[in-house]
Design a protein with these regions (language model features):
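Short amphipathic alpha-helical signal-transduction/dimerization elements
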Residues: 30, 107, 111-118, 204-208, ...
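Short amphipathic alpha-helical segments
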Residues: 195-204
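Acyl-thioester-dependent acyl-group transfer interface
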Residues: 5-47, 54-81, 90, 176-179, ...
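Non-catalytic, low-complexity flexible loops and terminal extensions
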Residues: 6, 85-88, 97-105, 109-186
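Helix N-cap motif at beta-to-alpha junctions
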Residues: 16, 96-97
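Alpha-helical hinge/cap motifs
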Residues: 95, 188-196
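Short, exposed "boundary/linker" segments that immediately precede the start
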Residues: 1-3
C-alpha cells in the first residue's frame, strides 16, 4: 500500500537531536495515542482502520525530500513518519489520520517526552505523563454535528493555475520566511484585516500583478483555506475536523489596487466562515457517506469516482494557504525550543502552497 503524506510539521530545538532518545520518546508516547496507533486495510466496499500493535516506526535521519509516499509495508504499517536533521524533528502525517491540529497535538507531546529523556531534571519536575491540555478524544465531530437540511456542494469551476517552471519530478522545494508577529499585526490591522486575510490577499495580489499583469477577465484566482471547526462546534477531537472554504478574486476590470483585492478576499471569506455555512459544507460530505445507495458499491468503483471528483476539485483552486496558528508550549520547555515550521504537500494543479504558523513572536 502506498500512502501520500500531506502534512509535515517540525520543531527546531536549541541542540542537535539524539536519535536514540527520540526513538525512545516515540516508543513511549505512541501507545497513548490511539489515533496514531493504526493501520489502514482495504475491504470490499471501503477502507477501514484497525489497531496496528507493532513497534513504533523507526526514527531515521532525514535523507530524502519531505512529503514522500509512505509505504506502509516498509513503515511497520504506520501512516506517519518521524525523522530528524541536526536540531530539527520532523513529523510527516497522512491526512486520513488527523489534521494540522491533531498533528501538532502529537508532535508537541513527542517533543516534550524527548526533552524529558535528554534532560532528566525536566522529568523530575513534570513526570512522564501527557500534558493536561493534550486531547486524546477520537470523537467523530462531523457525525455529531451533522444536520441533514440544506447540504451544499463544493465549487468545481476551474481556477487560474500557476504554470511556471517546476522542480524535477520527485523533488520538493521549501522556502521559509520569518517575521515578527507583533509587527505583522500592526500592518494587517492598518488595513482592518486579520493576519490570515492579509496574507491571502498578498498572495492573490502577487499572482494578479506578476502573472496576470493586472489584466481583467479570465479565470478567478481562488485560494483554498482550511477552517478548523473545533472552536465553532465545541470539539477537542484529534480526528480530522476541518472544512475548506475558498477566497476568490475575479478581476473584472484593469488596475485593481491592493486594498480592492483585500476587500474582495475579506468579503469572500466573511460570507463563508460562519457556523451555518460551515455546517452545510461538512453535512454535504457526511450525507454522501450515509448514502444507502453508495454503501454496496465496490471499493474499486468508488475509487474511480473519487479520483474524478478529486481531479475536478483540485483544479478549482489556484493554491492552498493554511494557517496552523500560534503553537503554544509549556513554559518549562520553552528554553529548549528555538521555533517551529510546517508545510503541506503539493497536489494536482497546485505546485505552490503556503503554510503559516507562529511560535512566541516569530511567524514562519
Amino acid at each position: 500500500t502506498v500512502t501520500g503524506v500531506q502534512t509535515c510539521a517540525l520543531p527546531i530545538l536549541k541542540e542537535e537531536v539524539q536519535v536514540e532518545f527520540l526513538q525512545q520518546a516515540l516508543d513511549m508516547i505512541l501507545p497513548k495515542f490511539d489515533g496514531f496507533n493504526l493501520r489502514m486495510r482495504t475491504g470490499v466496499f471501503w477502507y477501514y482502520f484497525e489497531e496496528n500493535g507493532k513497534k513504533a516506526p523507526k526514527v531515521t535521519e532525514e535523507a530524502m525530500f519531505p512529503c514522500r509516499f509512505i509505504r506502509q509495508n516498509k513503515n511497520r504499517n504506520y501512516l506517519f513518519r518521524v525523522t530528524y536533521y541536526k536540531s530539527r524533528i520532523n513529523l510527516e502525517v497522512f491526512h486520513v489520520l488527523t489534521d494540522g491540529m491533531g498533528g501538532i497535538n502529537f508532535l508537541r507531546e513527542l517533543t516534550y517526552q524527548y526533552l524529558r529523556l535528554v534532560h532528566p531534571e525536566l522529568a523530575e519536575k513534570e513526570g512522564n505523563k501527557l500534558s493536561g491540555d493534550t486531547s486524546l478524544s477520537r470523537e467523530d465531530s462531523f457525525v455529531r454535528n451533522y444536520r441533514s437540511s440544506k447540504p451544499s456542494g463544493f465549487n468545481k469551476e476551474k481556477a487560474y493555475l500557476i504554470k511556471e517552471d517546476k522542480l524535477p519530478a520527485g523533488e520538493f522545494g521549501v522556502m521559509h520566511g520569518r517575521m515578527p508577529v507583533s509587527q505583522l499585526k500592526k500592518v494587517a490591522h492598518g488595513y482592518h484585516a486579520s493576519l490570515n486575510e492579509y496574507f491571502i490577499a498578498v498572495f492573490v495580489w502577487s499572482v494578479y500583478k506578476e502573472l496576470l499583469h493586472g489584466m481583467s477577465g479570465g479565470k478567478p484566482i481562488r485560494i483554498a483555506v482550511p477552517v478548523n471547526l473545533r472552536p465553532y462546534f465545541d470539539s477537542d477531537t484529534t480526528k480530522n475536523f476541518f472544512v475548506m472554504v475558498s477566497a476568490e478574486f475575479r478581476p473584472q476590470k484593469e488596475s485593481y489596487t491592493f486594498e480592492e483585492v483585500l476587500a474582495c478576499i475579506q468579503s469572500s471569506l466573511h460570507s463563508q466562515i460562519n457556523k451555518e455555512h460551515l455546517e452545510d459544507l461538512f453535512s454535504y460530505s457526511v450525507s454522501n457517506q450515509r448514502n444507502l445507495l453508495m454503501r454496496p458499491v465496490p471499493l474499486f468503483l468508488k475509487n474511480i469516482a473519487m479520483r474524478i471528483v478529486y481531479e475536478k476539485s483540485a483544479v478549482a483552486n489556484t493554491t492552498t494557504i493554511t494557517n496552523i496558528g500560534n503553537i503554544k508550549i509549556k513554559d518549562i520547555y520553552q528554553p529548549y525550543i528555538e521555533g517551529f515550521s510546517a508545510f503541506i504537500a503539493m497536489s494536482k494543479g497546485q505546485y505552490l502552497k503556503g503554510t503559516i504558523c507562529s511560535y512566541q513572536d516569530t511567524l514562519v
